Amino acid sequence: MKIAVVGAGSSGLVTLKYLLDTYPATDIVCFEKSRSVRGCWGDQRPDFVSTSTKYTTQFSCFRQWSSEVAPKQNFEEFYRGAEFGDYLDAFATTFNLREHIRFGVELRHLEWIGGGWSLLLAENGEEERMTFDSIFFCTGLVNQKAQVASTGIPSTDKYEGICNATVVIVGGGESAADIATYLAKPEHNNTVFLSLRSGIRVSPRYHPIRGVPSDFLRNRLLLSFDKRVRNRVGERFVTFRIRFDRLLVWWFPHQGATKNLNDRAQALRREWDLKLKARAKGELFNVFHNKSDDFLDAVAEKRLQIIGPPIDEQWTDYFDFDQTTTLHLSPDILVRSTGYRSQLAELSGGVICLKDFYHGCVHTDRHNLFLIGFARPIIGNIPSIGEMQARYTVGVLSGKYTLPTALKEKQDEAWNSLSAEYGTINTENVYPVEQFAYCDTLAREMGIMPTLAAVGSLRLWLKIMLAPASTMHYVDECFDRQAIKREKVYTPVILLVFLALMRLIGVPFRLLKSVRNVRITPSRMR
């Protein structure tokens, strides 16, 4: 069998590793357009800080980081600068992956011809065609940024080096917030505006409860609640957290550094946090969250101004954020950060679409075509999800895991549900997921869920339920009992007791729902 992996970033590398564990090396080749395995996030400027922690954003098969929290909030728990690229370099070296990668090769077209996948590849300006039995498409959504249509102001996606200018950053995602924070630094002497069409949901990197990364308060007990309950209760808790963050710090003290903001700046930060939340579309866990929360400090210190959308395609005049006043800005430059789009349709002549992939990773008609890294988490990280997808898809290809019958019908139904659930997100371009709910779905089909029976120890199972949620908790060949025993639980006991009581109170309702589903199913089948 001839297998091609397209892309050698985080998704491509972990897919290549699992393929080499399963198939002869002579069957596999990986194509990478660049000359590096560091991926799109591997070489960041020195002051860059990731939004997910090192602990949660690592491969289960290559564990480098624990869930220890540093004494001060200096971002040691997060990837800084080029650290994630260093991690990918080390991963590739450890598993001898580079010898299976052809660097400097770009995919220009793929199609199914005569029982195989025909790839049009380009290297040093020369094109060649190669045919494979199976394709793992691992380029994700970072291959082509969405464009900004402006007829009046020059635009760019290259922002480093911009100084002494009036700048408008277009976009409300984490990258846009990060760019705005960077350009608003005093040493750059810019006048900076962040243009938003709606509100955004901002989640703190460090939580006021115990001052730990927010990732470390997200455990399986919390995630076990029905999504509708989490949406309703979570919405109210987030408002409480914003309004009364100082109270939470007092209740659950920590030694972390406090923000160097005066009372007026703190109040302005809080005001904008609430305003952005109020204007955000969709329910709490149905829209993407922004964990680049540093930009709120820049807003509080009046180094960054949040405005509304442009009035027309000239991009010289804008609404204010409340869209009650017109602002004439005439910026020197627009910085594009309006998200990314997939090139699947362009590369396949419109034949391959995201909606045709079961679980966002297995093509429903061609079970030898796979997507890795296209699922984007509402809260979470792509590399860990990519590893789960890689394990699942390699298992599907090898016959280890069996796909359900009537796959096309199941996927059509799942796609309609996904589009309805995430109504504010363009699901033709992005496959939105809740990280652990999605990974659990794959884990169930792989038979590696960390159930009490599978773990075999009540004490260890409780630690898995209460410690920071991680894809390293699945009961597979990488399952490490000793490492789990050493993990810490950061959620305060009083909150754990409250969550446990809520689960107990909900038992009768869950049983009633199960009985109703059993009764309804036969009638639907008739």
Whereabouts are the PLM-identified features?
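N-terminal glycine-rich dinucleotide-binding loop that anchors FAD/FMN and/or NAD(P) in oxidoreductases
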Residues: 44-69, 212-225
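Flavin (primarily FAD) cofactor-binding/catalytic cores of flavoenzymes
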Residues: 1-49, 69-211, 231-412, 419-526
